[in-house]
């Protein structure tokens, strides 16, 4: 049903069936959306015309009113409804069916002229923006409707829209329609059905708007899913003091706490809450008290000015609370609900599974499991692997925080800590981010057009809006830190400054925000790693209960290894030795080895490197005691280590006692036309076996020392970049001969394995021959992808955006494993290798090792483990568990 009716349409139908009060309406299916883009607007309107008019008559009968009628008018809303939730990304039109005559009939019917004209001016503005294309495209453009509203409010001497009287609202309608005629050259449509078809087509068109396309890319939503269109009878929250509108959540979307919460506005329409135009009040008393404490408002003032719905509308609150519980129990998930109260009658406009932060996701899944609402498999499948990343992000350093200057406090809309340079426009946020700057997007309020900037920013700060504003909902969905409703800040877009309690900050100044408690600080505050909850640990234990695939880490330092072990890594799948050479003392010895005139010179330099390497390995083995550590022998081309600047070459010449010219010539001789396919990997080891000998001594020497100290090291030595069996055999011979000598010298023997990286396509094709000698395979999917596609990983950015836009590629193959090409090479190599060595251990150690779809593929083809960066380990563990569960579905 969801695939056909979209999430909103399916949920409305389901709510109706279980007895939740829903305004009548109908849904145009997602299939029609695809036909709309295939056959065109006119063809689809002709096909739908009779069905839509028949459905409108059905709504008229239920509401006992008539669409377009002057005396007893039916007004409708037209909303999008994709299969997956896309909050704010597509378009909505409310109060459709009004014109100059109908508005007078609505005023007479409701005995509320202000409500009628307020609804009309909102409709003209919304229709003008969405259907007639009057919404500003560029950041410097002025919204004609907002400019008119500000002029009228200024002339009247009021601050808020709801302070305008009936005559003011009539003035707005007249001026709005004049603006429509001036900008579009057409009169504003007065025919109700003309308005309806314009709105339906605009919602379909919004499926392909820029922000919707960007959101689909972020969330992995296919374009062919399309959106449904929901046409629903309007109910009004702006009919006076017994009417209201609001958004609520069955649990806290930021923390996951099992606490009903939300916001409402009396005498308002739903868009007012989510757009952040007015800062709303809390639904529950406890929520209101927490809000007041954050704002520094006394209890007496809170009760008098900002009462909760629980206090101001107790009967409505009781019904709302009962129905939200009913909906959560029905869907077995946290619900995000929109509602309207029209003259004392509660209506639900929609419910959906609520967007939530990573922390809330884990807590809700685990607590619902404990409450018996869901089982273990559902709890695991309910968690999105990539969202676990949010739990692992740093928080502000407490000591630095104690010295920081607090500027103001807003609402804690999305948890976490963020600091960066202030920018005021979404385009600038994206541009600054691309230039390597960390930024915080500061806005009066955000809108869906700001999506790209929000994605690029470290965090978002808004002057207006509540916990359910656009900024809050989208930031939580992205896992971005957000502080909203910071009313003390005064944003000036023209001067690109923000004034906070007398302090003026300009674009480019540093600011720090805490989305967990709402505080805003001056300057840049250092961060420290986050502490994980008991729910997280329990989720990880549950992952291990179901997963078959093990998760190792890519780590080159004891700190990285310690982090990964804390996240549950069961070994190191890739320890890159070259990263150990870049300290000041080590790099000099490394350069001496590379630039030496002969073997003796190289050996002399290698003797200097040996103790450094051994000390590094010893610390890593100690950290990973009892777990396997897979060490890759030297891989990059040598030119990456040598100095290319004159100063560096002069220093090397002095250190080695040779001329600068000699150094320059040696450096020049190391440069290659295509270094990634040149003198690197096992080719270095076979050309200079003394390098392999030194590294073997360092690896196994460290293990021997630790064994004597009572530790239990498990070294694995990996030969990189082989394409021919003989390349491996030559390196294995050096390794084993060196090991035999070393063990004799040390008087202790360490079990170790020698394996290889499968990253050259020929190695995958001849894996059966290679497995006759190699004790394990580790697939280096970065280089395997590079060589299979023939794409340079360093240069793909020059054409990848075009390939993605034209759908030549669906995803970046360096981020998501190509299952049809690279994946088939992996599958073939595993089968060939195990045909010779049945117990052959196989894993991957490229960037794909922490990407959920790639992890699931690795499970499918029978790998033993994946290896990824430390902070991706929990993500891979969850994906590995989900892979097992998905097989059984």
Where are the language model's segments positioned?
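C-terminal accessory/binding modules appended to enzymatic or scaffolding proteins
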Residues: 1, 414-456, 822-839
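Nucleotide/phosphate-binding sheet-loop regions of phosphoryl- and nucleotidyl-transfer enzymes
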Residues: 1-404, 412, 437-440, 447-452, ...
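Short beta->alpha connector loops at strand-helix junctions that form conserved
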Residues: 26, 463-465, 484-487, 575, ...
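Long, charged amphipathic helices and adjacent flexible linkers at domain junctions
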Residues: 50-54, 218, 380-432, 438-439, ...
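Conserved alpha/beta-domain cores
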Residues: 79, 532-535, 542-889
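Short, surface-exposed secondary-structure edge patches
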Residues: 250, 430-432, 451, 501-504
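A short, small-residue-rich loop immediately preceding and capping a beta-strand
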Residues: 458-464, 482, 843
């Amino acid at each position: 049903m969801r695939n056909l009716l979209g999430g909103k349409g399916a949920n409305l139908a389901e709510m109706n069936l279980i007895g939740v009060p829903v305004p009548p309406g109908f849904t145009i299916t997602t299939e029609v959306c695809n036909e709309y883009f295939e056959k065109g607007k006119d063809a689809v309107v002709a096909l739908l015309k009779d069905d839509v008019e028949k459905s409108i008559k059905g709504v008229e009968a239920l509401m006992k009113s008539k669409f377009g009628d002057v005396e007893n008018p039916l007004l409708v809303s037209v909303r999008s409804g994709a299969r997956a939730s896309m909050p704010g990304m597509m378009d909505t039109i409310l109060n459709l069916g009004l014109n100059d005559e109908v508005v007078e009939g609505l005023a007479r019917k409701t005995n509320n002229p202000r409500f009628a004209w307020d609804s009309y001016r909102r409709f003209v503005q919304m229709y003008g923006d969405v259907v007639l294309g009057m919404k500003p495209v560029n950041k410097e453009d002025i919204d004609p409707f907002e400019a008119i509203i500000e002029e009228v409010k200024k002339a009247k001497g009021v601050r808020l829209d709801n302070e305008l009287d009936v005559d003011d609202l009539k003035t707005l309608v007249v001026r709005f329609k004049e603006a429509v005629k001036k900008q579009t050259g057409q009169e504003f449509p007065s025919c109700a059905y003309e308005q309806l078809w314009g709105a339906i087509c605009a919602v379909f068109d919004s499926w392909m708007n820029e922000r919707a396309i960007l959101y689909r890319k972020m969330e992995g939503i296919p374009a062919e899913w399309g959106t449904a269109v929901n046409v629903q009878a309007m109910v009004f929250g702006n009919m006076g003091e017994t009417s209201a509108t609001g958004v609520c959540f069955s649990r806290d979307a930021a923390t996951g706490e099992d606490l009903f919460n939300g916001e409402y506005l009396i005498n308002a329409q739903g868009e007012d809450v989510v757009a952040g135009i007015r800062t709303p009040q809390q639904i529950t008393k406890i929520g209101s008290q927490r809000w007041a404490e954050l704002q520094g408002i006394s209890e007496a003032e809170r009760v008098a000015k900002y009462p909760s719905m629980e206090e101001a509308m107790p009967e409505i609150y009781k019904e709302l609370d009962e129905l939200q519980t009913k909906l959560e129990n029905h869907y077995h998930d946290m619900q995000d609900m929109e509602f309207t109260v029209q003259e004392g009658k509660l209506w639900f406009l929609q419910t959906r599974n609520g967007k939530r932060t990573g922390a809330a996701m884990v807590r809700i899944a685990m607590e619902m499991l404990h409450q018996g609402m869901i089982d273990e498999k559902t709890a695991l499948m309910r968690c999105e692997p990539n969202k676990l990343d949010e739990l692992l992000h740093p928080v502000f350093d407490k000591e630095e925080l104690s010295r920081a200057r607090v500027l103001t406090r807003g609402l804690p809309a999305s948890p976490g800590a963020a600091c960066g340079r202030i920018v005021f426009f979404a385009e600038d946020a994206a541009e600054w981010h691309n230039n390597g700057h960390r930024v915080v997007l500061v806005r009066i309020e955000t809108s869906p057009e700001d999506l790209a900037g929000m994605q690029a920013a470290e965090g978002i700060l808004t002057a207006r809006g509540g916990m359910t504003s656009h900024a809050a909902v989208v930031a939580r969905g992205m896992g971005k830190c957000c502080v909203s409703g910071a009313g003390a800040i005064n944003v000036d877009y023209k001067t690109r400054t923000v004034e906070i309690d007398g302090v003026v900050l300009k674009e480019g100044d540093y600011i720090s925000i805490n989305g967990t408690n709402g505080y805003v600080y001056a300057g840049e505050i250092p961060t420290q790693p986050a502490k994980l909850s008991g729910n997280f640990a329990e989720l990880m234990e549950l992952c291990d209960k179901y997963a078959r695939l093990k998760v190792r880490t890519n780590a080159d330092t004891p700190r990285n290894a310690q982090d990964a072990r804390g996240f549950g890594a069961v070994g190191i799948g890739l320890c890159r030795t070259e990263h150990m050479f870049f300290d000041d003392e080590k790099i000099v010895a490394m350069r001496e080895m590379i630039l030496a005139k002969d073997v003796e010179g190289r050996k002399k330099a290698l003797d200097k490197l040996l103790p450094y390497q051994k000390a590094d390995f010893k610390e890593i083995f100690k950290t990973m005691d009892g777990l396997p550590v897979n060490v890759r022998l030297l891989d990059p081309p040598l030119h990456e280590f040598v100095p290319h600047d004159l100063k560096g070459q002069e220093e090397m010449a002095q250190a080695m006692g040779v001329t600068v010219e000699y150094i320059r010539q040696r450096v020049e001789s190391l440069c290659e036309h295509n270094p990634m396919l040149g003198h690197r990997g096992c080719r270095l080891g076979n050309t200079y076996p003394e390098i392999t000998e030194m590294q073997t001594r360092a690896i196994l020497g460290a293990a021997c020392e630790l064994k004597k100290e009572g530790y239990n090291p498990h070294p694995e030595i990996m030969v990189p970049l082989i394409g021919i069996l003989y390349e491996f055999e030559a390196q294995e011979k050096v390794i084993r001969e060196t090991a035999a000598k070393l063990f004799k010298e040390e008087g202790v023997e360490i079990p170790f394995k020698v394996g290889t990286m499968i990253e050259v396509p020929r190695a995958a094709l001849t894996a059966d021959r290679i497995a006759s000698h190699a004790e394990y395979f580790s697939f280096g999917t970065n280089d395997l992808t590079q060589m299979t596609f023939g794409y340079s990983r360093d240069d793909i950015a020059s054409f990848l955006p075009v390939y993605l836009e034209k759908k030549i590629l669906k995803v970046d193959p360096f981020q998501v494993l190509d299952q049809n090409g690279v994946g088939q090479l992996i599958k073939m190599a595993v089968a060939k290798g195990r045909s010779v060595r049945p117990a052959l251990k196989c894993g991957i150690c490229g960037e794909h090792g922490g990407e959920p779809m790639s992890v699931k593929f690795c499970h499918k083809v029978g790998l033993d483990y994946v290896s990824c960066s430390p902070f991706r380990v929990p993500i891979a563990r969850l994906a590995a568990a989900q892979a097992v569960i998905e097989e059984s579905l």
